[in-house]
Amino acid sequence: MRALSGPRLMLCGLLLLLFQAPCALGLAPLSRGHLCRTRPTDLVFVVDSSRSVRPVEFEKVKVFLSQVIESLDVGPNATRVGLVNYASSVKQEFPLRAHSSKAELLQAVRRIQPLSTGTMTGLAIQFAITKALSDAEGGRPRSPDISKVVIVVTDGRPQDSVRDVSARARAGGIELFAIGVGRVDKATLQQIASEPQDEHVDYVESYSVIEKLSKKFQEAFCLVSDLCATGDHDCEQVCVSSPGSYTCACREGFTLNSDGKTCNVCNGGGGSSATDLVFLIDGSKSVRPENFELVKKFINQIVDTLDVSDKLAQVGLVQYSSSVRQEFPLGRFHTKKDIKAAVRNMSYMEKGTMTGAALKYLIDNSFTVSSGARPGAQKVGIVFTDGRSQDYINDAAKKAKDLGFKMFAVGVGNAVEDELREIASEPVAEHYFYTADFKTINQIGKKLQKRICVEEDPCACESIVKFQTKVEGLLQALTRKHILSQKPLRGEGAVRRALWWRGGESLAPCVVGSGRLLLKTGWILAREAGLGFGTEKGEAETKS
């Protein structure tokens, strides 16, 4: 019998965990609840359109504005919206009194054109508080029931002072948000914004990702943010709250029905084997083109092991860097051949690392019915990254797990272990994997000889998952192409290299076919002889 090499064993654990029955997962969400009710607000956007903002970037700002407006309760007695456009001068595009419906506002935003001169941010804020929010322009008398809000969007250093005018606005009860883009002067943002500043200052590295802030402002304007707590939902068993919205789910042993609200008890056989699997792939600059090709091969090696069909496994693919791009949704392709071709054709984005935005996209888009997800199917996400995220991941990672998604985190090179753990489902040790070198990815499960399966006499490796894997042939030497890092270790004699596998904590003895494989997690030293290998933290050997 041939023992599993480190990379093959890593894939073994990953694949076996992927396809546990959905009934064992507990939560299985599908239904999105009501939109939030927003507090009556006089809201003025103050938008920088100086020459540093290119026309295509200004279009991105307009998309962001529209997304925020979409979430509001617009009306004379609800939220009123005005917009101030500025550069060297200030132009009021429309006052608070101009539009009483959401449709009118969205149309007005689409018509706005950039001014393309200097950057007089202080002058624009002064105009907003003295003119745009005035009674004559549609502003309502000050009241505890009506909020006064100004959102400033800028990408540069102002040519005038913002400190004093912003202080006067805050003292007058106006809530100021500051959004900075690119090479903006961050001290200026702090001078503008209200306290607490971590809630009122936002920065994005380019206009291409400004849209990701829209959800924050949608939530900020929600009057009712926990519909589960107020009972304003129709979930039969479990209500999972998000600001102004909710998702229905089921307790362990139940699956969600197609209505997205009610639950059915699972069959004794373990429930449906249907799985909706979405890859979230890091396409940041640090990956490099040659390594990105190895990642694509890794994806296709996993696809090779799946039963792809309308009733069994569906696959979706999302790439992220500074922005998030859906390569293809669940259900678009119905054969392995088509999926693998689409993966091979995926182009490399090569920018930043916004893992948090990618996780939010997975929650809000990838696993929705409109994107091909199936009621009752197990939801599995595999996040692949090579570095620290440039945005926050904690909230989105927690929400994905709260919604019952089974989340795996695969890290390479400079990937941060704490972030991998934050993403991974419980038990964490079974759901995150780390390798030191992209070259290893090409070896993981390469041309697997047997499809991993569970047979009548499963091998009880209880610390990871009960499984049996059939492999044929003799134990081969673990050469450089099989190892996960090239860290030399002390010692004389045979060539020794280091393998780090983060698959779990101390595996129990496991019978594989007619051989006995004893593994313990840790640094595994691969000896050139190939008939057995020792470890610094345990032993790994084969016995006939």
Swiss-Prot record:
Where does it reside?
Secreted, Extracellular space, Extracellular matrix
Among InterPro entries, the record links this protein to:
ECM_Assembly_Org, EGF-like_Ca-bd_dom, EGF-like_dom, Matrilin_cc_sf, Matrilin_coiled-coil_trimer, VWF_A, vWFA_dom_sf
Where are the annotated glycans?
N77, N345
GO BP: extracellular matrix organization; growth plate cartilage chondrocyte morphogenesis; regulation of bone mineralization
Extract the CDD domains matched here: vWA_Matrilin (cd01475)
Q: Which intervals hold domain EGF-like? A: 224-264
Pfam families assigned: FXa_inhibition, Matrilin_ccoil, VWA
The secretion signal range is: 1-26
Chain ranges of the VWFA domain: 42-217, 276-448
What is the disulfide pattern of this chain? C228-C239, C235-C248, C250-C263
Q: How is it modified after translation?
A: N-glycosylated; reduces binding affinity for type 2 collagens.
Q: Does the keyword Disulfide bond apply?
A: yes
Q: In which tissues is it expressed?
A: Expressed in trachea from fetus into adulthood (at protein level).
> What GO CC annotations are associated with the protein?
collagen-containing extracellular matrix; extracellular region; matrilin complex
List the keywords (alphabetical). Answer: Disulfide bond, EGF-like domain, Extracellular matrix, Glycoprotein, Repeat, Secreted, Signal
Give a yes or no for keyword Ribosomal protein in this entry: no
Task: Name the Gene Ontology molecular function terms of this record.
Answer: calcium ion binding
Q: What does this protein do?
A: A major component of the extracellular matrix of non-articular cartilage. Binds to type 2 collagens and forms long concatenated protein networks as part of the extracellular matrix. Required for the network-like organization and bundling of collagen fibrils surrounding chondrocytes in the zones of maturation and hypertrophy. Required for mechanotransduction and adaption to mechanical loading in cartilage chondrocytes, resulting in an increase in expression of the extracellular matrix components ACAN and COL2A1. Acts as a moderator of angiogenesis in response to injury.
Q: How does it assemble?
A: Homotrimer. Part of a complex composed of MATN1 (via VWFA1 domain), type 2 collagens and type 6 collagens. Forms a complex (via covalent bonds) with ACAN; the interaction increases in abundance with increasing age of the organism via an increase in occupancy of MATN1 binding sites. Interacts with COMP.
Supply the PANTHER family for this chain. Answer: CARTILAGE MATRIX PROTEIN, COLLAGEN ALPHA
What is the designated name of this protein?
A: Matrilin-1
Q: Which organism is it from?
A: Bos taurus (Bovine)
